[in-house]
């Protein structure tokens, strides 16, 4: 069993989508189920509706999964297992106030050492604990041995007890912390492999320690994917980068298939540059992912997006553009030398159907050609249409072609009219209205 475990705290980041895609591909290769686990236990950070948005994006990218699970639904198990750990003296009630902990942090900063809990509450007697009438958290005792694990990408890791510390597993309101809820749920769901971002590497020994403390012996394999950098700045893709948001990329007109293609391609060894997710399932190897940070280049994505638009069926592209006519799909592809996204193609097509009243500098010619076209019969090809206008108006050169292009396309430059006309001829009545 594999899981994709996003938090509903904001727009989906391309790094999270990459994690989802890799989990999907590997689940297909291993013929194991993929579940979506919405990690919603941090109520203060949750944003209403973001869970639904996550699922909509996954469906848009055709990422198949068995079921959707909300982490908060497991609260009773989180609390029950925490009580078990306390009963077994593997965890303890911590009454230390936020103020005291902050003082300890400040002392650590002054000494130039990492902050670690001082263990004050760990040795309180049962009687002392019962006599304290104050809110408390639950801390898991630090391990008495090193925690080791092997990452399928990054190799071996070895953490000393000092690195792991005695950490909180239940907050004062008795909701679970991230590492604790994650560990318990991975146990309950029988997760076999965890694929996630490298920012979780330091969480892994804590999660292993939690499972060890609960007597869970099944090994879970780990893959921690390198972070994604902005190719222009060399810095980590953050919320300040518009392109870090999957929602923004979709709104800009990037096809889901192209985005998925690029996220798999980045920092990877692939047999071809342009492919679909289904094709990637046939050859993808998680161990081929580079250990170095991947670089997100929006221009490279634009190139890949053009290729995916080119590969679309004409009717399919037409429907994406808001029509149901294969000729409009062909028209959209005509603009790919100048446009790279669906949004940009729409911006090229919209002027064709806009109302045009005149063309500055060619007012009389514009009027003559438009009146001529309004009286004209149907012409199947551009040459016949052009010859008809020449015969009716005696116009030629730029006096003919500039206003004619503007009437037919709404712009003064673009692909050849001989290429455009066959694709818009059936809409001529709407165009010259």
From Swiss-Prot:
Residues spanned by motif 'KMSKS' region: 236-240
Domain of life from the UniProt record: Bacteria
Motif, 'HIGH' region: chain positions: 6-16
Coiled-coil boundaries: none
Keyword list, A-Z: Aminoacyl-tRNA synthetase, ATP-binding, Cytoplasm, Ligase, Nucleotide-binding, Protein biosynthesis
Keyword Protein biosynthesis attached: yes
Pfam families: tRNA-synt_1c (PF00749)
Compartment(s) of residence: Cytoplasm
Binding site for ATP: 239
Keyword match Aminoacyl-tRNA synthetase: yes
Chief site of localization: cytoplasm
UniProt-listed Enzyme Commission number(s): 6.1.1.17
A GO term, aspect molecular function: tRNA binding
InterPro entries attached to this UniProt entry: aa-tRNA-synth_I_codon-bd_sub2 (IPR020751), aa-tRNA-synth_I_CS (IPR001412), aa_tRNA-synth_I_cd-bd_sf (IPR008925), Glu-tRNA-ligase_bac/mito (IPR004527), Glu/Gln-tRNA-synth (IPR000924), Glu/Gln-tRNA-synth_Ib_cat-dom (IPR020058), GluQ/Sye (IPR049940), Rossmann-like_a/b/a_fold (IPR014729)
Annotated catalysed reactions: tRNA(Glu) + L-glutamate + ATP = L-glutamyl-tRNA(Glu) + AMP + diphosphate
Family according to the record: Belongs to the class-I aminoacyl-tRNA synthetase family. Glutamate--tRNA ligase type 1 subfamily.
Known function: Catalyzes the attachment of glutamate to tRNA(Glu) in a two-step reaction: glutamate is first activated by ATP to form Glu-AMP and then transferred to the acceptor end of tRNA(Glu).
UniProt subunit comment: Monomer.
Name recorded for this polypeptide: Glutamate--tRNA ligase 2
